[in-house]
């Protein structure tokens, strides 16, 4: 068995040796053993691959000189494994590049022959290539493209299972290895040329704009934290491609996280290609369950879209128990029994953990639906919850057409304010008061909850007025929210939802930055659950 990482690896030559090539993936939650050998600031993919090699005791590795991180991985491994080879990968596919890559493949064959003490047979390679020789399937306009850095196979499969369109994977793991070798008299050189003619990755100098079909339904673009390659292409696509575009950022130990899957599901819903079971609207009562990180909210409506009852309880250690409890309270408040309920839709981060729901829908779609129902003049929804914040753009019909999320940390969220209230020794209710008149206009320089807490402690030690500190914290939260608004562009009217919408100080700070009043619903915490209930009623 020999491990490899790159699609330009001569996998078929390894197979011709009678060996098993295994694509190395990154996805380990901990890089503890890898970080003992490689700097902690190294690319997360390279660290994950190193962790994989250590975990599975892989003794043979072939790498390509894709980037500096992979070159450093080679440096670490060259005295740790029995066999390692680094292929120099050209950036072009002109005749000189083909000659260079051909020579690199010859060097690998010679090195592997010496290591294995066996001869390479071209006839074996020819048989393998002929078995992989057929025409590639044509692209379909009714497709969604995945670009950028490689995504884990299970995430790709979830996207395929979740949408009605064909998924075309343009990342380095997506293309099927097919070959049409014509010059069989110089098999290895033709093979080298075929490898360089694979769909170009960001390592190559070839123009990748030809990959994009203008009739695609949308693009999911994956970037790696701190990787130099992909953000440049994403920025160009964002400015030039007239297609729905979703950017996700992973470090390979979080690509299957609830936040990332929420973004993907919401994107598929907004483009109209999310798989949904078709249902007819029925008479009766309809329930929306919003299982959030901090609170669980339930709304019951009737067939005329009247809110019959709702409940809000803290989300405990188990999302399912909280959902059951909130559902029971809402039923009791409405004087109903479970048998009276026609349909239930679940949303929020815990939506997949609610087995009694008939369907699940992302909170992006549900907040948009609920906000537009409350006020159909709303075009931008600012939702600040316990652990994340998001801004949602609606069209004139209330459909979600764009959204941005801050879900990587608790900066600018309800949790941020709770920590600061505890540090100040006051209740969250006291902190929610508006402090328009301040003695000193203090600025909190860090949005990181940990560092901001240290700043607050320092301000307390300097005997700063508590109201001035609260005002500074409200400004910090508002600044984070406004940065999200500006990423999708300002467009009124604005509605604020989520528990933080009850904080008058934050609301005032955001209004001051926007220069426009926010619409605050009668109960901002239930808007997601209300949207879920409306979707349950409409049966779409």
Predicted features, each with a name:
Residues 242-251, 363-364, 511-530:
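Conserved phosphate-binding/catalytic loops in two-lobed NTP-binding clefts
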Residues 101, 315-319, 396-397, 401-436, ...:
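Glycine-rich phosphate-binding loop plus the immediately following alpha-helix
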Residues 289-321, 329, 400-409:
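Short glycine-rich, Thr/Ser-proximal phosphate-binding strand/loop in the N-terminal lobe
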Residues 1-286, 304-306, 316, 323, ...:
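An N-terminal assembly and electron-transfer interface module characteristic of large anaerobic redox
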Residues 280-304, 378-395:
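Gly/Thr-rich phosphate-binding beta-strand-loop-beta motif of the actin/hexokinase/Hsp70
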Residues 452-485, 525:
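Adenine-nucleotide phosphate-binding core of ATP-dependent small-molecule kinases
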Residues 262, 417, 521-540:
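Glycine-rich phosphate-binding/hydrolytic loop that grips phosphoryl groups
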Residues 349, 486, 490-513, 525:
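Glycine-rich phosphate-binding loops at beta-strand->alpha-helix junctions
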């Amino acid at each position: 068995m020999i491990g490899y990482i790159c699609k330009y690896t001569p996998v078929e030559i390894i197979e011709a040796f009678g060996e098993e090539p295994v694509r190395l993936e990154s996805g380990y939650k901990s890089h503890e053993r890898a970080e003992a050998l490689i700097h902690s600031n190294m690319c997360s993919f390279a660290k994950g691959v190193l962790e994989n090699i250590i975990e599975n005791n892989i003794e043979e590795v072939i790498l390509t000189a894709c980037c500096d991180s992979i070159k450093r991985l080679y440096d670490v491994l060259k005295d740790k494994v029995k066999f390692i080879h680094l292929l120099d990968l050209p950036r072009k596919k002109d005749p000189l590049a083909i000659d260079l890559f051909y020579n690199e493949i010859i060097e690998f064959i010679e090195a592997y022959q010496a290591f294995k003490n066996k001869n390479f047979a071209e006839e074996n390679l020819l048989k393998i290539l002929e078995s992989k020789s057929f025409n590639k399937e044509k692209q379909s306009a009714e497709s969604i493209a995945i670009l950028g850095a490689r995504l884990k196979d299970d995430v790709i499969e979830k996207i395929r299972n979740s949408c009605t369109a064909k998924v075309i994977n343009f990342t380095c793991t997506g293309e099927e290895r097919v070959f049409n070798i014509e010059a069989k008299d110089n098999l290895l050189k033709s093979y080298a040329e075929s490898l360089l003619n694979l769909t170009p990755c960001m390592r190559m100098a070839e123009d990748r704009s030809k990959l994009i079909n203008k009739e695609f339904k949308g693009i999911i673009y994956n970037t790696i934290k701190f990787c130099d390659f992909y953000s440049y292409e994403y920025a160009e696509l964002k400015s030039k491609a007239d297609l729905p575009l979703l950017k996700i950022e992973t470090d390979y130990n979080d690509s299957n996280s609830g936040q990332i899957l929420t973004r993907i599901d919401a994107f598929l819903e907004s483009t109209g290609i999310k798989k949904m079971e078709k249902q007819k609207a029925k008479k009766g009562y309809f329930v929306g369950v919003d299982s959030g990180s901090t609170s669980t909210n339930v709304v019951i409506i009737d067939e005329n879209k009247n809110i019959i009852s709702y409940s809000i309880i803290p989300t405990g250690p188990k999302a399912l128990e909280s959902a059951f409890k909130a559902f029971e309270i809402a039923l009791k408040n409405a004087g109903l029994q479970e048998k009276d309920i026609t349909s239930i839709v679940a949303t929020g981060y815990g939506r997949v953990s609610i087995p009694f729901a008939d369907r699940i829908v992302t909170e992006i779609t549900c907040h948009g639906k609920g906000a537009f129902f409350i006020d159909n003049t709303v075009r931008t929804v600012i939702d600040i919850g316990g652990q994340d914040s998001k801004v949602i753009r609606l069209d004139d019909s209330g459909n979600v057409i764009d959204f941005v999320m801050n879900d990587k940390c608790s900066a600018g969220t309800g949790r941020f304010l709770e920590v600061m209230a505890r540090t100040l020794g006051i209740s969250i209710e006291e902190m929610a008061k508006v402090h328009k008149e301040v003695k000193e206009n203090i600025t909190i320089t860090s949005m990181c909850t940990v560092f901001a807490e240290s700043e607050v402690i320092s301000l307390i030690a300097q005997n700063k007025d508590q109201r001035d500190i609260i005002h500074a914290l409200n400004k910090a939260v508002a600044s984070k929210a406004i940065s999200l608004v500006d990423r999708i562009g300002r467009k009124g009217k604005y509605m604020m939802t989520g528990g933080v919408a009850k904080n008058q100080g934050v609301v005032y700070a955001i209004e001051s930055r926007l220069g426009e009043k926010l619409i605050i619903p009668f109960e901002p915490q239930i808007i997601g659950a209300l949207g879920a209930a409306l979707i349950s009623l409409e049966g779409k």
